[in-house]
């Protein structure tokens, strides 16, 4: 799986995961001049800004480590733009780590063993 495919696969898996846990997906890939928020979701009266980090494995580092101070600042500024457009509400920032593992062939094509780690209130 190529890196852009891994990202798309990760975001799709993240949406399925969130919906299965009662989150409503408000939008995907919200963009502002500061950056992009992968998923904007809602649960229990709060907006949840979700950064998805998809990796094939944990060989180098945990995926959430890629959400450092600079990325957090961009996400906060982008969230402020979202609030300016849609109105302020209680909110939090979550990170979803998606590890796709290695592919195995099945009768229906390739299948991936996916592991998901949800970090609520990540920053």
Label each region the model flagged:
Residues 33-35:
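Short acidic/glycine-enriched loop/turn segments that link adjacent beta-strands
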Residues 1-28:
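Acidic-basic catalytic patches of nuclease active cores, encompassing PD-(D/E)XK
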Residues 24, 47, 90:
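Hydrophobic "anchor" residues on beta-strands that sit immediately upstream
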Residues 60-91:
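Mid-chain, well-packed structural core segment of small domains
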Residues 18, 37-63, 67, 75:
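Conserved catalytic cores of phosphodiester-cleaving nucleases, focusing on short active-site segments
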């Amino acid at each position: 799986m190529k890196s852009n495919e891994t990202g798309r696969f990760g975001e799709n898996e993240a949406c399925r995961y969130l919906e299965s846990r009662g989150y409503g997906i408000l939008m995907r890939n919200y963009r502002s001049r500061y950056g992009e928020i992968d998923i904007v979701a809602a649960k229990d009266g709060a907006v949840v800004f979700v950064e998805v980090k998809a990796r094939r494995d944990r060989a180098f580092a945990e995926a959430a480590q890629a959400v450092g101070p600079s990325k957090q600042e961009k996400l906060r500024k982008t969230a402020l733009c979202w609030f300016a457009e849609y109105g302020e509400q209680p909110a939090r920032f979550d990170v979803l780590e998606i590890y796709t593992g290695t592919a195995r062939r099945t009768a229906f094509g390739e299948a991936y063993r996916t592991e998901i780690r949800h970090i609520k209130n990540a920053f």
